[in-house]
């Protein structure tokens, strides 16, 4: 019980972000090729050594390293990095100074490497790719590659990103998650169906175990296939899931699936399908391995849509990793977790299975709260920050109410439930009060009442016109020049941490928007990897976002006043004043 409520608490606190840490203006950053100098060498042992020389003040993300073209069993083991905390992307593992990776001698052919790095001063370079020949030939071509991240609605919900070195922990987490899903309303009807096919047929214990294993393995293999597909889709799946209508649809689905957890209605497998499966199980005397396997595969396909919400969380996380091997193993582990109670049922009988009771209602409540939290989390990119914080406050009050109501079954944990209820009630109340005052900081909800301007990132977002192609940019520049208007070009990407920080700390400040009221604000979105995005970057030789360029009324850039990297509101306003006076 203690762990369950600790999990709920962590669900909220992982969304909180730290205070701002603005940097001085640093107009000159190294080109990406000098910040991260890559070399490859064929060793006498037959291995291929890959090395990145990383300049001081720069770092590479571990999770952005890709080795496309290397067989799953030959993927390299990445060395331990150092922890790095991003305000929006959470805890990350990064490499500084240098990174050495060795590909085994058995690897052959051309490999497409991918990586992404940033500067401590705030600049985030676009994702890079490089093709190398494992025979030792030099790298031949480099280009940007599409990579999107947690920010979006992202949609990662199961846990903090698990690094490559923590596969064991990740697989264990998916197995445990599957064990919980085994007692979801959609899964429970499969218990008597399989029992009727195995136990009711009079099969021996050994035969019953074989039949049940066939059922569970085939079910897990179907889930594994889902995981592999999600990993192969990778960034394409994430990019598709960033669309507002998709985020809204999934959020609505999570809310809908939370309602039966609180007893509003009952969600279960359609009676027609359940009856047909039961009939098929009765017709098979003694059962067969193939029959049980087919039944297991069908159950995964039939029950899967009924469990769309939790499955979506797992699939989204797997899509982030982009690793098909891990995706398949993770969903296979989840399927085994779902099937474990079935194996216990047919081998040990129902004596060792959990008995229905108040704990089931508690488990359903936990699922309901997690589903609601998932819905709120997914809507982050499309909601007013104040409204988003208010929704978290309302959910915290729901948690407090549920914890207070469950004190009757808490037993010796009565005081823990009571303290947890009071804690969530206090936090939820502060979130609502802060949201009502225009605040948007989950970690410090009442700071809005301390005085000083309050960021309004929605107003900032509305003030910008999003540009995604060179044609759109040229049209906007021509229009501004015809009107004798200044233009601010803001290079932005969803995977850019500093962009999201500046959205709030710079462009969300009233004094900044007031100073820019006569300036045409263009946001150049270079999130995706396509020809348009690369041309937008190359037109002004921009290394990556965040970068801000001033275009004068004559249509030419004020190059000496360019801002590259993260700055605070005061530094930004000072640069704008200098630009305006220097014309």
Swiss-Prot record:
<dbReference type="InterPro" id="IPR003834">
    <property type="entry name" value="Cyt_c_assmbl_TM_dom"/>
</dbReference>
<keyword id="KW-0560">Oxidoreductase</keyword>
<feature type="signal peptide">
    <location>
        <begin position="1"/>
        <end position="18"/>
    </location>
</feature>
<feature type="disulfide bond" description="Redox-active">
    <location>
        <begin position="186"/>
        <end position="306"/>
    </location>
</feature>
<feature type="transmembrane region" description="Helical">
    <location>
        <begin position="214"/>
        <end position="234"/>
    </location>
</feature>
<dbReference type="InterPro" id="IPR017937">
    <property type="entry name" value="Thioredoxin_CS"/>
</dbReference>
<feature type="transmembrane region" description="Helical">
    <location>
        <begin position="289"/>
        <end position="309"/>
    </location>
</feature>
<keyword id="KW-0813">Transport</keyword>
<keyword id="KW-0812">Transmembrane</keyword>
<keyword id="KW-1133">Transmembrane helix</keyword>
<keyword id="KW-0201">Cytochrome c-type biogenesis</keyword>
<feature type="disulfide bond" description="Redox-active">
    <location>
        <begin position="496"/>
        <end position="499"/>
    </location>
</feature>
<feature type="transmembrane region" description="Helical">
    <location>
        <begin position="359"/>
        <end position="379"/>
    </location>
</feature>
<feature type="transmembrane region" description="Helical">
    <location>
        <begin position="326"/>
        <end position="346"/>
    </location>
</feature>
<comment type="similarity">
    <text>Belongs to the thioredoxin family. DsbD subfamily.</text>
</comment>
<keyword id="KW-0997">Cell inner membrane</keyword>
<feature type="transmembrane region" description="Helical">
    <location>
        <begin position="382"/>
        <end position="402"/>
    </location>
</feature>
<keyword id="KW-0520">NAD</keyword>
<dbReference type="InterPro" id="IPR028250">
    <property type="entry name" value="DsbDN"/>
</dbReference>
<dbReference type="GO" id="GO:0047134">
    <property type="term" value="F:protein-disulfide reductase [NAD(P)H] activity"/>
</dbReference>
<feature type="domain" description="Thioredoxin">
    <location>
        <begin position="458"/>
        <end position="581"/>
    </location>
</feature>
<dbReference type="Pfam" id="PF13899">
    <property type="entry name" value="Thioredoxin_7"/>
</dbReference>
<dbReference type="InterPro" id="IPR036249">
    <property type="entry name" value="Thioredoxin-like_sf"/>
</dbReference>
<dbReference type="GO" id="GO:0009055">
    <property type="term" value="F:electron transfer activity"/>
</dbReference>
<keyword id="KW-0472">Membrane</keyword>
<feature type="transmembrane region" description="Helical">
    <location>
        <begin position="245"/>
        <end position="265"/>
    </location>
</feature>
<keyword id="KW-0732">Signal</keyword>
<dbReference type="Pfam" id="PF11412">
    <property type="entry name" value="DsbD_N"/>
</dbReference>
<dbReference type="InterPro" id="IPR036929">
    <property type="entry name" value="DsbDN_sf"/>
</dbReference>
<keyword id="KW-1015">Disulfide bond</keyword>
<protein>
    <recommendedName>
        <fullName>Thiol:disulfide interchange protein DsbD</fullName>
        <ecNumber>1.8.1.8</ecNumber>
    </recommendedName>
</protein>
<dbReference type="InterPro" id="IPR035671">
    <property type="entry name" value="DsbD_gamma"/>
</dbReference>
<keyword id="KW-1003">Cell membrane</keyword>
<feature type="disulfide bond" description="Redox-active">
    <location>
        <begin position="118"/>
        <end position="124"/>
    </location>
</feature>
<keyword id="KW-0676">Redox-active center</keyword>
<dbReference type="GO" id="GO:0005886">
    <property type="term" value="C:plasma membrane"/>
</dbReference>
<feature type="transmembrane region" description="Helical">
    <location>
        <begin position="413"/>
        <end position="433"/>
    </location>
</feature>
<feature type="transmembrane region" description="Helical">
    <location>
        <begin position="168"/>
        <end position="188"/>
    </location>
</feature>
<dbReference type="GO" id="GO:0017004">
    <property type="term" value="P:cytochrome complex assembly"/>
</dbReference>
<keyword id="KW-0249">Electron transport</keyword>
<comment type="function">
    <text>Required to facilitate the formation of correct disulfide bonds in some periplasmic proteins and for the assembly of the periplasmic c-type cytochromes. Acts by transferring electrons from cytoplasmic thioredoxin to the periplasm. This transfer involves a cascade of disulfide bond formation and reduction steps.</text>
</comment>
<dbReference type="GO" id="GO:0045454">
    <property type="term" value="P:cell redox homeostasis"/>
</dbReference>
